[in-house]
């Protein structure tokens, strides 16, 4: 007899002829090819969780299609054998329906055994996937713990910096007091110079009276010489004090320069730490959204690279694909700039929304069919 059944199988197996025996042989070859393909699926799809899910879904669809084909072909094999018995092509009498399994070489038993094996395999793989999801959740919890420790260390570092700033403020206060003392010394030196001027006037007055005091000239000269000696000593001391003050001024200038350099270096270091912390927080939120989206939970806000939150710029929150689809083009571009995505064409529409979806980690196999609208 002739049949029009579709024997396209995906394994390049030639279709059977119209005999029941050849159809049973075709079924056995298909089962072996199917087992080999399933084993290859298991071996080649363990690299990442995403690939494993995709392979799992593809495998389940493939198993369902193949199971349906097997059922149709086995039903066809029974019909053909019954037809051959009725036409006299088979050399033994037709048996009742319950003996069909025996006439086909125990094929029903093998079908049910294979179905049980496939069900057990699917259950074990589902359990393995749940175990992997549990491991992933534990990993995320560990990352959150490390981030909390890092925040604690950052708090300690900020406190140390505040302490250093306080000590520097105290040092500046002491420097101000020292400058006031130096100014006071300079004022006293000015007063001393005034007194020296008065002394010079007194000496001039003494010289005017020398004509009247010739008898006391010798004594006056001795007094004047003594005064000159003391004046010379005082000038030397004043010169030494000026040198000390000049050296102190140079040291103060050098200390101010070094202090400013240290503050600049410290500011640069703090900026680098803030940049890295902001980027780390952005990536952590992105990976968290990937897991939440895969589990059909709403996305959490992802901070920008500079540490600011989107709400600081009065941008609407993004918790789902619909929120992205409702953005204006200006809001979408502002979001992309905040996440460091700057290379795109101004003519893009749907592609901009897809870039923003990837930037915040809003992605799941279950949402691949979502289509965005143009602006």
Curated annotation (Swiss-Prot):
Keywords: Cytoplasm. Gene3D superfamilies: 1.20.5.170, 1.20.5.190. It comes from the Eukaryota. The keyword Cytoplasm applies. The keyword Cytoplasm applies. Its main location: cytoplasm. Transmembrane segments: none annotated. GO terms for cellular component: cytosol. It is found in: Cytoplasm. Belongs to the UPF0612 family. This is UPF0612 protein C569.003.
């Amino acid at each position: 007899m002739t049949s029009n059944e579709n024997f396209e199988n995906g394994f390049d197996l030639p279709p059977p002829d119209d005999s029941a025996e050849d159809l049973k042989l075709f079924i056995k070859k298909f089962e072996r090819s199917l087992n080999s393909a399933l084993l290859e699926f298991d071996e080649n799809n363990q690299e990442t969780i995403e690939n494993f899910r995709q392979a799992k879904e593809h495998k389940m669809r493939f198993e369902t299609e193949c199971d349906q084909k097997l059922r149709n072909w086995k039903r066809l094999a029974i019909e053909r054998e019954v037809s051959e018995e009725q036409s006299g092509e088979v050399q033994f009498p037709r048996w009742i329906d319950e003996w069909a399994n025996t006439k086909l070489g125990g094929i029903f038993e093998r079908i049910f055994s294979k179905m049980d094996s496939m069900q057990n395999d699917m259950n074990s793989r589902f359990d393995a996937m749940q175990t992997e999801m549990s491991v992933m959740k534990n990993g995320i919890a560990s990352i959150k713990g490390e981030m909390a420790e890092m925040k604690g260390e950052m708090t300690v570092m900020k406190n140390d910096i505040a302490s250093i700033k306080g000590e520097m403020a105290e040092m500046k206060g002491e420097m101000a007091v020292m400058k006031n003392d130096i100014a006071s010394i300079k004022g006293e030196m000015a007063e001393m110079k005034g007194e020296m001027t008065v002394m010079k006037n007194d000496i001039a007055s003494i010289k005017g009276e020398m004509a009247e005091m010739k008898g006391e000239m010798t004594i006056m000269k001795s007094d004047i010489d003594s005064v000159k000696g003391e004046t010379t000593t005082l000038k030397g001391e004043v010169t030494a004090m000026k040198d000390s003050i000049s050296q102190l001024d140079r040291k103060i200038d050098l200390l101010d320069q070094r202090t400013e350099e240290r503050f600049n270096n410290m500011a640069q270091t703090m900026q680098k730490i803030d940049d890295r912390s902001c980027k780390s927080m952005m990536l952590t939120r992105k990976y968290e959204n990937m897991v939440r989206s895969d589990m059909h939970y709403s996305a959490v806000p992802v901070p920008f690279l500079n540490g600011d939150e989107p709400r600081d710029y009065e941008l609407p929150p993004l918790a789902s694909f619909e929120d992205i689809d409702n953005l204006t083009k200006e809001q979408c571009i502002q979001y992309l700039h905040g996440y460091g995505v700057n290379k795109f064409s101004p003519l893009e529409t749907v592609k901009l929304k897809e870039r923003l979806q990837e930037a915040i980690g809003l992605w799941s196999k279950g949402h691949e069919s979502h289509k965005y609208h143009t602006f």
